[in-house]
C-alpha cells in the first residue's frame, strides 16, 4: 500500500511496488467502457485506460486505438473492449463487431463472431478479453472470455431511476 512516506517522497518512490499494486486484481481495476445512445439515436463509445500498471515503456494498449479499443457507428451500433488489449488490436475487435452488425448479424452474433476471430489468430486468444456492444436499437451484449466466472456490467436505460447490474 502507498503510505504517507511514499506520498511525501513523490516522485522519488520505487515504481515497481506501485506497478505491482496497479495490476493486483484485488486492488487494481479494469478499463472502463462507456457505450451511450441519446434520444435522437446517436451512438457513442469510449474507454478509459486501465492505468499505467501494464503500460511499460513501448507498450500501447488498445484504448486509444479507434477500431481496436472502441468503435461506434450510429447506423449499426457500438463496441468497446477491456482486458488484454493486444488481442483487440490484432483482431480490430471493436470495429469488427460493428462491421458484423452492418452485415446483418445481431449484436449477440457479432460479438461471438469477434471472439471467434480472436481465437483464430496465430497463437489463439491469449488472456482475458471482455467485449461490450450495443446495436442501433440500444440492445446490449457483453461477453467475458477467459475472465472472471461471474462478470457483470451496468446498464442504465431511459426512464430508470438508476443503473442496474446485469450478468454477462
Which residues are covered by each model-predicted region?
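N-terminal nucleophile
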Residues: 1-168
